[in-house]
Amino acid sequence: TGCSISGKDKKESTTKSLAASEKAVEKEGMDKEEAYVKASEYMRNMTLEEKVGQLFVVNLEQLDSSKGSYFEWKKCSKKMAETVKKYSIGGVIMFSRNIGVRKQTKSLIKKLQNNAPVPLFVTVDEEGGDVARIAGNPDMKTTSFPSMEEVGSKQNTEYVKNMGETIGNDIKKLGFNVD
């Protein structure tokens, strides 16, 4: 089941491992033309199935529905690992129900990434106030911020910049790469 193509359009996957992909982004200051060339080359080496899979960001229950459509997955199950690998999904979104403590969250993200043929976007909704999947959990030991309404009322761009940097740094340490 799933996406399938046949005939001359089908080719074997030649996507690089996570380690190889990380090396490609280590270089900073890449100009737009060089980035375009590298991205085009990478895309040329992807199968159609991998390209389609990259369009999807899913929750953990969509990777493993064996416990129902709303389960508090906190570990990477064998089925999740297989699904990430098989469909080359673009990313996962995690919710409060998936986030317990720092070590558990890092481990879950690492195992998902280790099974992904293309590095995943790992997302979490972390705005401040009531929208704080990480900071709202005292076991995560991250910085809490007020709601966006309160932040906006301050009209302090330096505060907003520092807030964004702090949230970004806090979630990056856990393995998230999209807020």
What are these regions (language model features)?
Residues 31-65, 85:
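Mature N-terminal segment immediately following signal peptide/propeptide cleavage
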Residues 61-76, 81-179:
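Enzymes and membrane/adaptor proteins characterized by extended Gly/Ser/Thr/Asp/Glu-rich
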Residues 1-2:
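C-terminal motif of bacterial Sec signal peptides marking the signal peptidase cleavage site
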Residues 6-45:
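N-terminal, intrinsically disordered, polar/charged segments of Gram-positive cell-envelope systems
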Residues 18-25, 58-60, 85-90:
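Generic detector of short, locally flexible boundary/turn motifs and exposed helical patches
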